[in-house]
Design a protein with these regions (language model features):
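N-terminal leader/linker segments that precede catalytic domains of diphosphate-processing enzymes
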Residues: 1-270
């Protein structure tokens, strides 16, 4: 493929055939107020998608968090070499989902480690606060406060084996991934009870109906809720199943868990 050189735009030049995704995953955990068991909270999103004149609804159960943000693309280019965003949307939102020359992979790791250690600042935003706040608002319709939880960095997970992405903006592109991991321990018993009540109230089928109804009313065709599960129960299940290394979801208690949930579960084994 020959593409016109475009700096840090969205049109890749020849040789820019590695997609790198840097994401933030937050393990939201709390003690069940009734029995003291450790619970894991996950986000459930339901989206109505139109394709070829037909509509379908996709329900995803995934960790809280989102993409790391590039704060200073020019400085990042000085550090890792030229790059291109994987899509116009990633560029608009400054998401760290980029196409690079494979030879610059190690430079990206260095920059990420420097930001985690505090040696370098101002190039990448690894804070999970914005995403957490938005996702709690979407699911529970509340304003998450800093005093409601304590945030602990858990390091960086590197997935340097190439796998094709299922991201709709760059489907099938060979991708390496970096995850910045955090624990968010909830402090508010009121919030814990709200999460568990929300999890029990809405089934995945309910979320599908809500997304369809939202689309009919002219909305974006979306609905959000939470899922709270026993962390130990989910860990036992995860350890009992075979993993093929692909981006394949897991079916747990009738819920399809996104493949990146495993990054949170493997934290418990460290």
């Amino acid at each position: 493929m020959n593409y016109e050189q475009g700096g840090s735009g969205t049109e890749p030049s020849e040789g820019f055939n590695l997609r790198v995704s840097v994401g933030i995953l937050v393990r939201v955990i709390f003690k069940n107020p009734e029995n003291e068991k450790i619970m894991l909270a996950l986000e459930r999103t339901s989206t109505s998608i139109k394709s070829e004149g037909k509509s379908r609804v996709v329900v995803r159960t995934k960790p809280f968090g989102g993409g790391a943000r590039i704060l200073n693309p020019n400085e990042l280019m000085n550090l890792i070499g030229d790059f291109h965003y994987d899509s116009g949307r990633s560029q608009e939102e400054s998401d760290f989902r980029i196409l690079v020359n494979p030879g610059n992979w190690e430079k990206i790791l260095v920059v990420c480690r420097e930001h985690l250690s505090g040696k370098r600042v101002g190039v990448i935003d690894f804070s999970p606060v914005r995403e957490l706040t938005e996702e709690f608002q979407d699911s529970l319709h509340i304003q998450l406060r800093s005093q409601d939880y304590s945030l602990t960095p858990r390091g960086m997970r590197i997935e340097d084996e190439l796998t094709p992405t299922e991201n709709v903006n760059a489907p099938g592109f060979p991708t390496k991934r970096i995850y910045i991991l955090y624990d968010a321990w909830l402090k508010s018993s009121v919030l814990m009870k709200m999460i568990m009540a929300n999890s029990s109230k809405y089934s995945d089928a309910n979320l599908e109906e809500m997304a369809c109804e939202d689309a009919k009313k002219g909305g974006k065709g979306r609905a959000n809720a939470m899922l709270s599960v026993s962390l130990n129960q989910l860990l036992d299940f995860y350890r009992s199943v075979q993993h093929d290394g692909k981006e394949s979801p897991m079916l747990f208690m009738g819920h399809q868990l996104e493949w990146n949930v495993r990054a949170l579960l493997e934290l418990s084994d460290e």
